[in-house]
Every structure is written in structure tokens, then in C-alpha cells.
Amino acid sequence: MLDLSELKKKTIEDLLKIAEDLGVVSNGRMLKQEIIFHLMKKVVSDGGAAIGGGVVEILSDGFGFLRSPEANYAASGDDVYISAGQIKKFNLRTGDIVSGEIRAPSEKERYFTLVKAHSINFTDMAKLQRYVHFDDLIPLYPEERILLECNDPISVSKKDISMRVIDIVAPLGKGQRALIVAPPRAGKTIILQQIAHSISVNHPDIELIVLLIGERPEEVTDMCRSVKGEVVSSTFDEPGYRHVQLAEIVIEKAKRMVEHKKNVVILLDSITRLARAYNSVIPSSGKVLTGGVDSNALQRPKRFFGAARNIENGGSLTIIATALIETGSKMDEVIFEEFKGTGNCEIILDRKISDKRVYPAIDISKSGTRKEDMLIDSVCLKKVWLLRRLLSSMGSVEAMEFLRDKLLITKDNNEFFDMMNS
């Protein structure tokens, strides 16, 4: 039995070896999807069973496909077709995670077809239960802390105190809607990688998705190799509709998981480029704001960001997104102004701090979390307020240097707070 999802995770060299063992003829110029297609077709044609899975994307015609995270949810030749009848029978929606038995395409068909579904959203068909739709769930303030301070000695340097600073200045909770406001070369990508690592180490129960929109290909590779979680991307050389399609599938998948009481974190880099993509694909309304932004363009990216919430009786969706400023583009400034105030946590990076090579380049006085008293115990909260009063009289660079020096001589934040007593 061959599993389509497992084949997609293999390298081309491994696939060619499997093809050789099964007697599948392949030349050296075939794409990875073509090799997988011929492998699956060979197994099914010989009477073997094949299993396929992926995330449902329903098209406007009523039928749909199972898209693969390995292909960044883009349309490819090894996608699995789902008929409109099956979609109605199982009440499938875009974002559902489906696995089941598939058959090879006939002469007039182009895709594998789902024959029998085995599980939907990791639940066996026999155990499927009713669930409340995402829009009907009750949102609450974040109550459970996402601790970022990581004591993993293998991968975290003692001199790296970025996560400890965020835990003090702008603590995160499950269901947070956080915005990292960053000028160019201020270290936002490194901070995102460290947040992803801390979540995977400290909170293995959280489903982590890193969504990269409009990034450079080498940064995507670096993120894939440094993050233990799902990393999907649409690079800067891809058209705007691809950015939009990827973002829509990711947010719908996250919603389906939250409906099943899972805790999901999406790290989005960046919401500015996502808003630019929406601006390029939506039909023109005739009303254009400053910088060339259509008045209706920001509604859908706002809906994406606004989906982050803590859910009553279990489940949460946390979105930590970066917003670009000081890029020289008027459009980026307008987009940032529209998103400013929509989150309940802001981490502001300062170019003046990064220019002096002081990291993390966080502006302590401007960064913070709403309702932080629900995440931090009262004793630590009083010390955080005392620290803020002390740092408020300093400039942004001096405040960060002062806090950095104090954190470097302590092992963790608890020791730092104990030191404040003395």
C-alpha cells in the first residue's frame, strides 16, 4: 500500500529509487509530481491499494481537490479530485483535512479520485460528531499563557534574550492577535523563527503553521530548516492570486482545527504583502485611498487577522503577524494605519536600536499586551509595571540596553524578578 502524503515528503532521489524497484520507467527530466503520479498509477493498476490525503479546496463549480502542504497548497498534477456528491454527503468545507482510499485516473481523466474517505480532521468516519461552526463560537480574551522563554540548551544561546524580553514586555496568550511592527533589517525574521522554536519546544500540543507571503526563496528554505512545524510559502515572484489562495486555505484549515478544540498558532510574514496581494486581485470599487489602496481591498485581510481568538470551552487561534513600516511606500503606511489598533498585542521594533546592533530591537515603551493581567500573576505584574516606570525615563536605545544587561546576568526571568526584590 502506497501513501500519497508520505511520497510527497520524500526527495526526488528516493522517489527514483522506488520507481526503479517497482519497474516504473522514468527519465531524468521528470518533475517530482510526475514521478509520484506514475508511481501511484502503477501501484493502483497492479491491484494495490493507495491512500491519499490533504486539505480540501472547494472550487466555484462545486467539486474540489485535496491540496498538499508539501506543494504549498498549489494546484498540481498529483492532487486528489473530490466529486460534488462526496462534498455534499460529508458536508465538506474548504480547510477540512481528509484522508482516504484513492483510485488511478482513467484514460480521459487527469487526477486521482477519492473513492472512500477514511477520516475527516483526524477523526474516523465512524466517530464523526457534530461541531459548532467557527463563526458561532464565543470569543474570549486570552487567558492561558504561551511562554516563550526557552531553556533548551542545544539550540538557544544564553546571550539570546529576545523571547525573555517579549515575555516581560508583551506576553502572549492562546488566542492572541499580535502585530510585530518592523522597519527593514530590524530582525523580524529572526524573532519569528525564535517564537516558532519556543512554541514547538514549550507547547508541543499547539499546531504551528508558518505562513510566508512575498518572502525571498532562500528565507523560505531557512525557515523550513529551522522550524519544527508546517511551513508554507508563496514567494515574491509568484502572482498575487497565489498569495491570496494560499492564505485562504491556511486560515480555513486553522478554523476547522479550532472547531475541533485544537490550539493553533499562525505566524504570518507579512500581513502588509498579503494586503498588497488582495489589493491587486479584487475588482476595483472605484474608490481609491492614498497610496493606491482600493477601499474594499483590506476587508479580507482584516477578516484573516480578526479570526484570531480564544474560544470558550476549548480551542484557540493565535495569529502573530508582521507589518512593514518605513519602506518608502505610501501604500505600506496606509496598510499599517488600517491594521494599527486591530490587534490586542503589539511588538514594535525600532530601527535606531538595530542600527546600534542591540538585539532584540524592541521599543519597550511602545510595545505591550492588552489585558496582560489575565496572563501574568499579580506579583510579577507589579514588578513589570515597576520596570516600565523605571525605563520610561530613558530613551528607546538606553532602555533596551539596560534591560538586556540585566537579563544577561540572570539565568531566567524568575531569577531576574527575584533580583528586583534585592
UniProtKB/Swiss-Prot annotation:
Lineage: superkingdom: Bacteria
GO BP terms: DNA-templated transcription termination
Keyword flag Nucleotide-binding: yes
UniProt: ATP binding residues: G173, K174, G175, Q176, R177, A178, R185, A186, G187, K188, T189, I190, R216
Entry EC number(s): 3.6.4.-
Enzyme class: hydrolase
Pfam families given in the database record: ATP-synt_ab, Rho_N, Rho_RNA_bind
Keyword Magnesium in annotation: no
GO cellular component, one term: cytosol
Keywords: ATP-binding, Helicase, Hydrolase, Nucleotide-binding, RNA-binding, Transcription, Transcription regulation, Transcription termination
Gene Ontology MF: a single term: ATP-dependent activity, acting on RNA
Annotated InterPro entries: AAA+_ATPase, ATPase_F1/V1/A1_a/bsu_nucl-bd, CSD, NA-bd_OB-fold, P-loop_NTPase, Rho-like_N, Rho_factor_ATP-bd, Rho_N_sf
Location of the Rho RNA-BD domain: 49-124
Subunit structure: Homohexamer. The homohexamer assembles into an open ring structure.
Described purpose of this protein according to its UniProt entry: Facilitates transcription termination by a mechanism that involves Rho binding to the nascent RNA, activation of Rho's RNA-dependent ATPase activity, and release of the mRNA from the DNA template.
Family affiliation: Belongs to the Rho family.
NCBIfam families cross-referenced by the UniProt entry: PRK09376.1, rho
Protein name, UniProt field: Transcription termination factor Rho 1
Name of the gene encoding the protein in the UniProt record: rho1
